[in-house]
Amino acid sequence: MASMKQQQTPASSAVTAAAAASSSATAAVAACEGERKAAAINSELWHACAGPLVSLPPVGSLVVYFPQGHSEQVAASMQKDVDAHVPSYPNLPSKLICLLHGVNLHADPDTDEVYAQMTLQPVNTYGKEALQISELALKQARPQMEFFCKTLTASDTSTHGGFSVPRRAAEKIFPPLDFSMQPPAQELQARDIHDNVWTFRHIYRGQPKRHLLTTGWSLFVSGKRLFAGDSVIVVRDEKHQLLLGIRRANRQPTNISSSVLSSDSMHIGVLAAAAHAAANSSPFTIFYNPRASPTEFVIPFAKYQKALYSNQISLGMRFRMMFETEELGTRRYMGTITGISDLDPVRWKNSQWRNLQVGWDESAAGERRNRVSIWEIEPVAAPFFLCPQPFFGVKRPRQLDDESEMENLFKRAMPWLGEEVCIKDTQNQNSTAPGLSLVQWMNMNRQQSSSLANTAAQSEYLQALGNPAMQNLAADELARQLYVQNNLLQQNCIQFNSPKLPQQMQTMNDLSKAAIPLNQLGAIINPQDQKQDAVNHQRQQNSIQVIPLSQAQSNLVQAQVIVQNQMQQQKPSPTQNPQRINGQRLLLSHQQKDQNLQLQQQLLLQQKQQLQQQQQQQQQNQQQLNKSLGQLVNLASQQSKLFDEELQLQILQKLQQQSLMSQSTSTLSQPPLIQEQQKLITDMQKQLSNSHSLAQQQMMPQQEIKPSLQATPLLPTVQQEQQQKLLQKQVSLADVSGVAFQPISSTNVIPKTGGAMIISGATQSVVTEEMPSCSTSPSTANGNHFTQSTKNRHCINTERLPPSTAPMLIPTSIDAVTATPLMTKELPKPNNNVKQSVVNSKLPNVAPGPQNCINHALQTDNLETSSSATSLCPSRTDGLVHQGFPSSNFNQHQMFKDALPDVEMEGVDPSNSGLFGINNDNLLGFPIETEDLLINALDSVKYQNHISTDVENNYPMQKDALQEISTSMVSQSFGQSDMAFNSIDSAINDGAFLNKNSWPAAPLLQRMRTFTKVYKRGAVGRSIDIGRYSGYEELKHALARMFGIEGQLEDRQRIGWKLVYKDHEDDILLLGDDPWEEFVNCVRCIRILSPQEVQQMSLDGDLGSNVLPNQACSSSDGVNGWRPRCDQNPGNPSIGPYDQFE
């Protein structure tokens, strides 16, 4: 009976509006004003009684009114559906866009049930202000209220009892009690929705103690006729005043009197008022009862637009929907869209009111409708246990003038529409493509279904043009809808670099099905690309630009303007017949197809021109490369000739030395012979110097060649062959003569196999004071220092030679030295476990700098270090590199390429000849290359612990000589002449030798894990070998036994323990979907989710940041797979479990 009284006033005004809408609206407004004068309704209390999901649109905004939903409210209030004899109104559309003129809040005087009275006026056009008000209504959230709600029990409604208030609610809402009193008590005053004051006594007593409302409560229960099951709401407003509200339990209505209007008459009144207002654009009044109505039927225009054009609905789409729970709580339930059809295809055809058929995940969660409207749901594209949070980038700040009003409206209404999503590029793991909205990202895999949906939606609007009641509104609305859809599609094309541009243009403009995706243009235009080698083909594919972004945008805008202009030109008038309208639609469709085909041809032509230009550019580059290679080959052949001439000159010098030594007694008797030999030597030197100058002139133009051409592997191969020939000749000459000689060599390389090296007992230490040095500190020892070894009697101690004849010095480390027949006794066991080291020689008459160091770019495997403090710049007094080498080829940074500082010997100053008794005047040139196997096998720690012992065991030289050698080497390499160093004692100075180097320590090689980490909340992480198991069931059984949850992972309950894992592509998936072999190959770590975590994710739709605040670390490395470290930001809830999944 109470519900009937509540609906009597709306029904009466609706029937009157059918006869005269304007007069009924005026009377209703007058009646509401009179009622409002009697009792003002508190807005906070009204909304609290209405429910947490009810939000009334603001006055002056645009709304969408659905008569079908209004009729459902009448049926729900009367507990009776619409009868078949209720007439239909064909001129009444399924929805009306109206301007909200007024909203009045009311409450039933008998039941205290709340309802609202709204005055609406249909509009065909609307201004900017109304649209802005609708937009702002979505942004402005309703302020949080301090309240509590309790469902009354039988003891609460008894006349001799009191109202038991929950402890936390009493402490939060009520004023604090004075606990010094016994018992603590106070008097409270509260106002109901009709502004009536009620007085209660609040006392804290009982066993156990509890908060009670005693005196005055029985009067309130009897006055409001409350029963068990009803709910009482207590609100504390801004002025700290208490407000009382009532929510009645849903009960069957009592028998309705025959004098009351029947439900059929009420249906007729509602529909008649709406039809009259739509036909005359006149105001009409409706009543909205949030407690009786299944759902809102007056929707804010911005909310409707956002839901309709931002969500592309398809069958099988997952969604979540908010529902009200007990005591004014809310909860989201997950569901699936199972169908899209009209709720009432006879009366309301093509209506969007509850046209989605849905199925719910939890069948026993309460009574929920099997049909919903699109603006009531939130579509989701990922399963409930996935969280897309790591893929979000930082929001780019936008200005108000950057985008259109409608786009800003959507993004402000739903903030996650403006979030940007980073999509990983499958070709390049380091590159991302930000700037994609979440809606577009969710709908990437549904392009075909969205195309069909858009085509059907556009055809629906085209068909609506024939409706006389919608002629003025449909054209305006159609242009706006096309504009919004085109903008969304345009963003898709631009963000994906337009690889699917024709397909999306077909969706937007109904193109022909013969459109060719642009990612196939390369194979159509130039099929010969497949015959090229893989490198050039890949380079061409990467360099192809499908279409510039600005050009793609301009093409889409052009097509959009054309469609809108044609729609406006072809807008039918009310006097046109249906046949002419159909003919215009057909003509418009053909024109669109012709224009789109022309756009496709222009795109194909542009792609062909760009491809031809790229091919021409590549041919020019190839020609230039071939020309440069030819010049380098010629240069290599000329240098080989110089090597032969140098060898001849060395032989002559050797002969001269032998003749001087063997015929020292007969020098005065044979002067003509000596003069003849000297003349021959002088001629050879002149010829050699001329050849050097010619080679230098030919090599100067090669400095302009790109660095990529200098690394051509052809030249090192030719030079290595020539160097090996030269080395063989020199070794054979040394063996024959038996006397160490000094060659003048233009090469600065030492063979990898290790040639014959002449070892001398004499050492030479030279100071370079003419030029700045790159060493850490300048040398202080001046003059020449010699140490004579008694064992090397066949070696000659030579004085410093003039710059024209001084040799080029390249000292080597221990492993580069291989013993000659002369050194068999000295070095019987060469150690091959020590990596080679190189120190650059010094050039004469050249300015210091990184370009003056020796370049090893001709080697296939070089050594490199950055800014080594032990590398020295050239000096005049240290020796001569042959004049045929230009200074531009000497690059310090390329010299130490691929070096590992912590596993190799320190470089030695070229001015120091005391490297294990090696005389720099008797050194030959050998190519130095990096031993790859040695680098991988050497361990830095082992090397540091045993270097001195290995040197002592493998190279048993004299102690005095070694001490002198070591001291000189350290002083010259590190600039510390007073450093104590003794290589004989392996227990000291190893750390000083290795740790005081100027090269930075190389990072330790990261070990590859062969076991998979498993995490579970509240437990220490474990590591398992996935390869041990044969399938998912065995793995689940092992994990359950490992973490003590046996029998809980194998059951099939809907909400229980879940296993998820992260694969090699950083995607989080549910365990058990992929084949077992693929899972074993791609799994990186596994996560066990508890039922509470699964339930929390089903509520929120994702794995929030506060689900796992305290995750235990793994026992192996102390790193959490779901968080960077356990002790990092322990109190920051924003550090979610998915921030770093590694």
Curated annotation (Swiss-Prot):
Domain PB1: 1009-1093
GO cellular component: nucleus
Coiled coil: none
InterPro entries: ARF_dom, ARF_plant, AUX/IAA_dom, B3_DNA-bd, DNA-bd_pseudobarrel_sf, PB1-like
Keywords, in A-Z order: Auxin signaling pathway, DNA-binding, Nucleus, Transcription, Transcription regulation
Tree of life domain: Eukaryota
Subcellular location: Nucleus
Molecular function terms from GO: DNA binding
Region (Disordered): 1114-1142
Biological processes annotated in GO: auxin-activated signaling pathway; regulation of DNA-templated transcription
Induction info: Down-regulated by auxin under light condition.
Annotated tissue distribution: Expressed in roots, culms, leaves and young panicles.
DNA-binding region residue numbers: 148-250
Domain notes: Interactions between auxin response factors (ARFs) and Aux/IAA proteins occur through their C-terminal dimerization domains III and IV.
Role summary: Auxin response factors (ARFs) are transcriptional factors that bind specifically to the DNA sequence 5'-TGTCTC-3' found in the auxin-responsive promoter elements (AuxREs).
Family (UniProt): Belongs to the ARF family.
Matches recorded under PANTHER family: AUXIN RESPONSE FACTOR 4-RELATED (PTHR31384), AUXIN RESPONSE FACTOR 5 (PTHR31384:SF14)
Subunit (UniProt): Homodimers and heterodimers.
Name of the molecule in the record: Auxin response factor 5
Gene of this entry: ARF5
